[in-house]
Amino acid sequence: MHKTDIEIAHTAKKQHITEIAQKIGIAHENLIPYGHDKAKISSSYIKSLNNNPDGKLILVTAINPTPAGEGKTTTTVGLSDALNLIGKKTIATLREPSLGPCFGVKGGAAGGGYAQVIPMDDLNLHFTGDFHAITAAHNLLAAMIDNHIYWGNPLNIDPRRIVWKRVLDMNDRALRDIVISLGGITNGFPRQTGFDITVASEIMALLCLSENLENLTQRLKKIIVAYRHDKTPVTVADLNAEGAMAVLLKDAIQPNLVQTIENNPVLVHGGPFANIAHGCNSVIATKTALKLADYVVTEAGFGADLGAEKFFNIKCRQTGIVPNATVIVATIRALKMNGGVDKNNLTEENITALEKGAANLVRHIKNMALYGIPCVVAINHFDSDSDAEIRTLQKIVATTGHKALICKHWEQGGKGAVALAQELVTLIEKQDSDFKVLYQDDIPLVQKINCIITKLYGGRGAIISATILKQLESWEKEGFGTYPICMAKTPYSFSADPKQYGAPVDFEIPVREVRLCAGAGFIVVICGDVMTMPGLPHYPAAEKIHLDENDQIQGLS
């Protein structure tokens, strides 16, 4: 019987965080320790690295996720350990898990098996308090908006046009739509508003896109929180809130150093969702790792249609980061599910369903070619995978001109991904990245939306109401037309229908809402039924999480 992830994590032999730091040349005085096994890297030290050459960057992405699981974080960790095993100084850079899905569906997000980040329980829960700081900064701004109106509203804010909600790092559907300031005149002016989850906050996004604290402050100032009665925007700068917000975020902007089970360095920092935000860890963590290592392995959330697309078209576009290679993670089980097999029958050999479902993987491979980046497929191995299924999938991938390598890092750690590591090193040394973004800054916003849908998703285009079209045109006139698009849609399909598996074609994506994130520097396009405040499932993971008789946390996975 296999050990659980948390059992493996609890028996891992951790090294002191100063030892991990020494492996990548960081002296203990440049760390801000949080106990013995985690630390922040000081901003002053990061600044001193500016003249260091950059290492090579590998992005790990995946097919569209299914309940069968793909193992993207596990592969990121296993690949990083494997690269270190073959003598390449490597750092993995990941996002911080959110409490919401931790207690909801996932039960944790630190990798799995013998390819995990530790301390796993701390990482999945409060960690170093970054999310709490972001929540506090976001809600301070919300309080200052209502306070401004209470004390006479000199900015002439229209209470009906306040676009800044409050946030909480929890899945709580009851807070999606609420009325505040009830109870009489001493409590302010009643109005309808709601909560988003913290990882959907624009502050989370802009912190992860900021280059330093000064850049963070400038981005904060640009956030649009409301509109006046004459429909002109009200910003954070108008409320003089950026200083206090930056104070709350001054420690949160510093990346966190932890380790894998094999005692290799990992920077874990920031955590925007990929279905409702841009889905990448912080620019500061990525750039710091590139200055310290030969290779950096990072991931982008959900499938390549969401996380990788935003990594390329938002993160790389804004910061000048250039990836050298991409890994697409797939499992035979998930591809069979894409081919129509019920979740309960995925362990049975089914070549026909695999061939049908592999269309999802093939489309993702072809999409990577649009960005000009070398690509490898990692088949995350399960015991139920038959030899015939493995051969079939490798042949399908070979027809696209790419390789598919079996990876067993979940059960073997880094040595289970050595073949993948060696292939990537060879590929990067042999083939230069010819990276390019999907669309140019100067094309109209509607054209950018349709470009993503037609070129990447395989659809006909977007269904956009006259009201939303008018809003997009207005933003273009106000100077926001050069912003990239951040699509918010279901991660489970190329389409807006989460049940449309495989590689659907000839569909349209309904656009429900658009949001201008002037601080983060992108426009969110909300499609279909996607929610910015999730709810808990029928049987939340929280029901299985508890303390045992030794006060050890159990139930995280």
Swiss-Prot record:
It comes from Bartonella tribocorum (strain CIP 105476 / IBS 506). ATP binds at T66, P67, A68, G69, E70, G71, K72, T73. Keywords: ATP-binding, Ligase, Nucleotide-binding, One-carbon metabolism. Pathway: One-carbon metabolism; tetrahydrofolate interconversion. HAMAP family: FTHFS (MF_01543). PROSITE patterns: FTHFS_1 (PS00721), FTHFS_2 (PS00722). This is Formate--tetrahydrofolate ligase. InterPro entries: Formate_THF_ligase, Formate_THF_ligase_CS, P-loop_NTPase. It catalyses: (6S)-5,6,7,8-tetrahydrofolate + formate + ATP = (6R)-10-formyltetrahydrofolate + ADP + phosphate. GO terms for molecular function: ATP binding; formate-tetrahydrofolate ligase activity. Its EC number is 6.3.4.3. GO terms for biological process: tetrahydrofolate interconversion. Belongs to the formate--tetrahydrofolate ligase family. It holds the Pfam family FTHFS. Gene3D superfamilies: Domain 2, N(10)-formyltetrahydrofolate synthetase (3.30.1510.10), Formyltetrahydrofolate synthetase, domain 3 (3.10.410.10), P-loop containing nucleotide triphosphate hydrolases (3.40.50.300).
